Amino acid sequence: HKKGSTVSNLSSSRALRDVTEIHGGKYFSSPVGLMHVINEMKKKKAVFGGEGNGGVVYPALHYGRDALVGVALFLSHLSRMSMSVSELRSAYPKYEMAKEKIELSNGKTPDKVLEKIAKSKLAGTLDRRDGVKIDFQNSWVHLRKSNTEPIIRIYTEAGTKEGAMKLALEWKQKINSLL
């Protein structure tokens, strides 16, 4: 497909950003949710987007999540590059993710806890569009409330599984210390 801008949500891997920028495009993020991704894609005239669940949005065909389009794009790229899957995988950035959650009780609300975190001194770049996302040089943490139960979800990404899990557990401990 043609080169250009891409979009994924705040809880998705940095890999799309890295690949987009390597190829001279611009990467944009959106809050979690397909409609947020699609709206941002339309605003930025993105050529590709999606969320971390594997469903991609490819506007050249339609503005909807379509895992089969993702498979077709992957297979055509694999064929064009004449590589094995493992060779292709090793050519892309490697990141690992971890997930944790904190159940709130005693009337504590996720919004108040997230606000307290956002106002604290943080050592990264803060994004408040969907909870609290903090980007560090080689990792990130995204803290967001559930819309269905009193919990805060913790999503992290780092270069190794151990690094991602360590970051998730550190933030779980930080949040628990605020409760």
Language model feature labels by segment:
Residues 2-179:
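Phosphate-binding and adjacent anionic-ligand microenvironments
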